[in-house]
Amino acid sequence: LYPNFRSLSIVNQDVFTITIGNPALLFKNGKVVYKEENEKVFYDSMDFWNDKEGLVVGDSMDGCISILITRDGGESWKKLDCSIFNKRLPNEGFFAASDTNISIVGNRAWIASGGINSRIYYSEDIGKSWKIIETPIIQGESTKGIFSIDFYDNKNGFAIGGDYTKPLENISNK
């Protein structure tokens, strides 16, 4: 087994990495702390609110996006139940190439999706509840949507994207 690492986070003295593909493996300091086996499993990005609480986001499987949450410093991870995303859309995914589709400021988190449907998943309470925000960014095909998101504070942020097959086009991409 040769892991293909997608995301890296360092929290205090702990190093977290996650792989893409089947099986998905999440490591803490070289030890597997979460494993998921599924033909469609693909985790894209990881970030932490603090030294105890963090999240990992992955592409949709069976019509539900994949979000993992830890509340114990990464010793264990729990996949959020799909029912909390009551407005989920089919074929919604995340762009893994950038590892910048999560932004965390204080207790808040923004997760930018892309592809057929490109929206922002927003939590203001360390991932305990989520709102879904529609965006005007170009979308509708698997190559379009938000590629990266970042917030400076609770009210000021920026999302960019477009269509990665048409890098010279500058239409509805920010």
Regions found by a protein language model. Give the residues of each.
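Residue-level hotspots at or immediately adjacent to binding/recognition sites across diverse folds
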Residues: L1-K174
